[in-house]
Amino acid sequence: WYFFAIFVGVIVGLMFEPLPGGAIGFIGVTLVAVLSPWVLYSPAELAKPGFKSFNAALTWALSGFSNTTVWLIFAAFMFALGYEKTGLGKRIALMLVKAMGKRTLTLGYAVAIADTVLAPFTPSNTARSAGTVYPVIRNLPGLYESKPNDPSARRIGSYIMWVAIATTCVTSSLFLTGLAPNLLAVELVAKTAKISFTWMDWFKAFAPVGILLLVLIPLVTYWLYPPEVKQGDEVPKWAAGELGKMGGFSSREILLAILVMVALALWIFGGDFINATTAAMVVIS
């Protein structure tokens, strides 16, 4: 019950964020380690000859930092942060919107492709969809006087937003590193069933269904929830203007793009000679 109380306290802290999430988690682990005789171990374990609860508690507290899954999640988040800080994620989305935004249907595919390109290196659908894709596409409905919570949303806004939401649900499952819980699930399967998955194993297993869904989402949405605006020049013009403001590719964007391609190549082709976590850490280093 003491452990449960600390666990609930950490969850509440993460919800209300009086401190950064990392600090709250660290405090929770530290409390469990310090109070281990009452929180972590049973009287029978404490009574064992030579058992030192505080040494064992320290080993428990630090065990997570030796977990390869944790480090792979960390590495993927570093890539996601790089997309945001360099502006490469925004540039990719704008380039796709500029190239495919003249027709509403192809605009839907541009949104889907943008999310798919970012997914392997963003293990959070919130960070990917809401943090990178949404800041770009939220500007598009207004170009056609399509407003949220208004009948005019049917002009184009509802279509774009629904495609974005549905797409990120698929890309989160398509790639092992597309969502942090995927990595935790692989770790759980490895421990319980003694079955290991590589990055490529996961992708090949879901690709037949995932790719089909990515192809169908913009099209089926276009049929079932048709936008009133079918085509126009406003979106490509707006995207071209935004790209003009960003200027040419910076050296940081080019470097990040190269590192991303190297990491992806190692994950796809290097499974037989290098661990996915090692590959990610090498690239980040």
Descriptions of predicted regions:
Residues 22-149:
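Membrane-embedded alpha-helical segments and adjacent helix-loop junctions characteristic
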Residues 1-72, 191-192, 201-285:
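Hydrophobic transmembrane alpha-helices of multi-pass small-molecule transporters
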Residues 12-19, 114-124, 166-176, 265-270:
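Transmembrane alpha-helix interface/packing and boundary motifs in multi-pass membrane proteins
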Residues 18-28, 88-89, 93, 97-99, ...:
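Alpha-helical transmembrane segments of integral membrane proteins, especially early/N-terminal helices
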